[in-house]
Amino acid sequence: MEHTTTHNNDPLVLGGRALESRLFIGTGKYGSDSLIPRVAEASGAQVITVALRRVDMQAAAGNVMQHIPQHMQLLPNTSGARTAEEAVRIARLARAAGCGDWIKIEVISDSRYLLPDGYETAKATEILARDGFVVLPYMNPDLYVARDLVSAGAAAVMPLGAPIGTNRGLRTQEMIGILIEEIELPVIVDAGIGRPSQACEAMEMGAAACLVNTAIASAGDPVLMASAFGAAVRAGRRAWLAGTGAVLEGQAQASSPLLGFLDS
């Protein structure tokens, strides 16, 4: 695959918005919500996701929304939804509350492993896309589910790298690679990424972006970790744009001549 775009002109376009940063961050699990603006600044992220169930629009204080920088693109999610109908209701409530038209669909009826329901996710995606939402569905990295989501009107697909909150890394790497090759939508790796090196690897594969929450929020120094993830995502993207060298099997190949220079 030939990559002609340079890193100086390489926006990720979603919902009509050109994003310079390909790192998305979350708002959960921080010891204090007051860390969120510092994490956002350190990461360079432009998109931030928040569970609507954590938002109290009537509260004068203690509202996570107060800590989200105004320049950031808000990506409400439907965490807590168990059916398509519940996800649609949450999305419409978010829009009515002034949270915009972007929505991350999470439909999870499995409370142990927190794996997304592909059928219900596609159903919700179709309804909300018709309603004018920019729909980013969280999904298992399954090609057939991804194709259903494309047909349903998704703006991107968000396959999990590992179960939510586990920091296990890219356990589904080969399946994500298939989606990157086959799906004509941005592939945003979501859930399970635990280290900056793993985010870098996802970007080197050709992922359009990474969403990272737990790995940053649970770090000893979340602000410094956010900076590390921002740098890793940029490095991985530049490596993909540059085109990595071929992997040789069998014998080694010298990078400079081994013979002849002593005879000259």
Swiss-Prot record:
Compartments where located: Cytoplasm
A Pfam family cross-referenced in the UniProt record is ThiG
For this UniProt record, the keywords arranged alphabetically read as follows: Cytoplasm, Schiff base, Thiamine biosynthesis, Transferase
Q: State which Enzyme Commission number(s) the record gives.
A: 2.8.1.10
- Subunit structure of this entry? Homotetramer. Forms heterodimers with either ThiH or ThiS.
The similarity comment for this entry is: Belongs to the ThiG family.
UniProt protein name: Thiazole synthase
Please give the organism. Answer: Oleidesulfovibrio alaskensis (strain ATCC BAA-1058 / DSM 17464 / G20)
Q: What gene is this protein translated from?
A: thiG
